Swiss-Prot record:
Name by which UniProt lists this protein: Keratin, high-sulfur matrix protein, IIIA3
GO cellular component terms attached to this protein's record: cytosol; keratin filament
The organism's place on the tree of life at top rank: Eukaryota
Function in brief: The keratin products of mammalian epidermal derivatives such as wool and hair consist of microfibrils embedded in a rigid matrix of other proteins. The matrix proteins include the high-sulfur and high-tyrosine keratins, having molecular weights of 6-20 kDa, whereas the microfibrils contain the larger, low-sulfur keratins (40-56 kDa).
UniProtKB keywords: Keratin
Organism in which the protein naturally occurs: Capra hircus (Goat)
One Pfam family, short name: Keratin_B2
Amino acid sequence: TGSCCGPTFSSLSCGGGCLQPRYYRDPCCCRPVSCQTTVSRPVTFVSRCTRPICEPCRRPVCCDPCSLQEGCCRPITCCPTSCQAVVCRPCCWATTCCQPVSVQCPCCRPTSCQPAPCSRTTCRTFRTSPCC
């Protein structure tokens, strides 16, 4: 009936898993522990998912092959609400000069690998500056 993924619940209290209402899907509970976000997500800039993992995705999750665990590298049904890119992105920027600054700022990858909101194809000098 209600969500088992709030701050006062745990996966154990849900019998090892839970079902959330269709109108509410907690992005921190919609993926296996191996795919938790470990880098900043846009808008909220939450660095790490701390709530219990109590609902696996219905469809297979596409983890980031670069181990960046970007918030958009999973099916649309499992994307955080702040994500705008909804496709799994291959690690085609692995040999370029720098890492993405954030989920929506993959500044150092070929144009063919950039999500729609990004237009920059070269790295900026300062790592603290947004790229896209």
